[in-house]
């Protein structure tokens, strides 16, 4: 499991590498021109738009440059957006089991989902039991989107821990 300290160290290293790659004048920041050149070098489709957007969003002190902390913020936001997108896709894919569309998966819906996914009845029961043991955190015999999301965050270690 990745700790917050390790995650932030990795983020800092990635930030330093990005700045190092684009910083032409050695001030440990990326100016608008340096950002543009970096994105152009990386063959971004519209480096002007990307540069202007990043500066607008993450140049917190509005000095026309991105500092290490501002770049870390940008990378962290990008990571969170990607993680949340993946989480939503994961939850949505599992919630195909919600046959009555009430935003809850019952044990029987889970079992039926596994059967229609190719498991035999015995396997489907085992899979449904396992799913409910792992995911139904409030033991109400239903799995909600939030329970599934929280399970995925923990199981796949999406966000770093203490």
UniProtKB/Swiss-Prot annotation:
InterPro entries attached to this UniProt entry: EF-hand-dom_pair, EF_Hand_1_Ca_BS, EF_hand_dom
Cellular component terms (Gene Ontology): nucleolus; nucleoplasm
GO MF, one annotated term: calcium ion binding
Binding-site list for Ca(2+) 1: 23, 25, 27, 29, 34
Keywords, ordered alphabetically: Calcium, Metal-binding, Repeat
Pfam families (alphabetical): EF-hand_5, EF-hand_8
UniProt binding sites for Ca(2+) 2: 59, 61, 63, 65, 70
Domain (EF-hand): residue spans on this chain: 10-45, 46-81, 85-120, 123-158
Binding site for Ca(2+) 3: 136, 138, 140, 142, 147
Superkingdom classification of source: Eukaryota
Subunit-level organization: Interacts with numA/nucleomorphin in the presence of Ca(2+).
Record protein name field: Calcium-binding protein 4a
Taxonomy of the source species: Eukaryota, Amoebozoa, Evosea, Eumycetozoa, Dictyostelia
